[in-house]
Amino acid sequence: MKKIVLPLLLAAFSMAAHAAGCAKPRNAFDQVYCSSTQFSQSDRDLNQEYDRVKQALHPAEQATLKHGQLAWLSQRDARCSLEKDEGYFVNLECATDMTQQRIAFLRERERECSSTGCVDAKLGE
């Protein structure tokens, strides 16, 4: 039992210390790490919500949703990233904010589809 508890306590402590570090990043690398972690979580949430909405739709509506999602991804990437000779630059705050807005949009579509029916034009946005 002691062999299990100690690693769990160490893991919990390191996660708590890391979480506190994200509240007040010490330098640019900490900020990039924290922003990246936040974006990754938002991206996972987005994928879950997209799948939830998609499962509730008929095939034609799924195609419309996919078209809208791909267009949105292109828009997010164009707005929040830049390609230069040195490589790619991504504004993670921009990407996270846009992703959170998209999650809210998809949740609205999910509520709409389950209550009054889907509006195809909105699915394609």
Mark where each language-model region is:
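Sec-dependent signal peptide recognition
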Residues: 2-8
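Short, linear, compositionally biased motifs with a strong N-terminal bias
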Residues: 10-11, 83
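N-terminal signal peptide c-region/cleavage motif recognized by signal peptidases
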Residues: 12-17
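N-terminal alpha-helical modules
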Residues: 18-125
